[in-house]
Amino acid sequence: MADRELTQPDRQLLAAVARLAGVDRVRVMDETLHGESRSTFAVAAGDDEFVVKLVPGAQRAINNQRRLVRLVRELRRRGYPAPEYVGVGESGGTIFTVQRRLPGQTLHAGPGMPPAPELFAAVLPSLLAAIELQRDAGDLAQPPWPAWLLRTIETGGDGYCLHATMRQAPRTAALLDRLQTLARRSRRDEVTTRDVVHFDMNPANILHAGGRLTGVVDWNIPFDGAGQGDRGFDVATLLFYTYDIEQTREALWERALELSGLAWTTVYLCHLSLRQVEWSRRHSPSSADDARFMAIAEAVLHDCAAQGA
């Protein structure tokens, strides 16, 4: 699920972006996009601003991104604060999407840092209401959820959730063993599969203006069948990434349990613990980011067990 690393866009790609956006030409904006993956860049055409996201893969990637555009358009029709997608394009083997840029700034204070507690508390009610609009918005009769999610816990993922990273140190190895044990005994009860799932609903992908929610960005369907499952996973994601904000922790726990129950909320938090701890340990070992997410993961797993998981 690793994103394509962005290099300087070439003229051919920019011309294709302009055609898709219905303008004569676009210029690359000289800024780093916060709240989007490293495979994105912003362009301007007159007074209009767009976000271009590069997507790895070939024809199948095009089909998945077209499906993404359909899903997000349906969410917007329901009133969801998602970006307006102009469409999906291809240039020289590069697949890309173009969306209109939403106003606002990201919730997080910086990479790996939590949002200000008062700010997050102000935005949270609107964010939970938005997630509720994902209910029954999926388009697949038999989505692969949660089988692929469970595989990340058992064997690892494609470019993320790497178990080899976790086995390199006693503390992370113990965390992996613990979350696997918790997840295995929590794989019970019926699971929701009909909702749209963002899958990375962390503060870096949430926009606000003065404490008012303005958008949820960085939508993606990286493989066949992704983007559909249990919307409670997105609530669990918010819970994990803001676990050190006491002001909102209880409300997020309550909503996660209402949607998914303790068993599946535990499975989701086990995956999130693995995903973020492994990523931080591999990319920024011994950093404040690494330390913060390790502490959150240990606290999350402790609290899951304390509730009876």
Per-range role (PLM):
Residues 55, 102, 202, 220, ...:
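Anionic group-transfer/hydrolysis microenvironments
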Residues 2-5, 59-63, 227, 283-292:
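Short, flexible/disordered intra-domain loops and linkers
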Residues 30-141:
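ATP-binding pocket architecture of kinase catalytic cores
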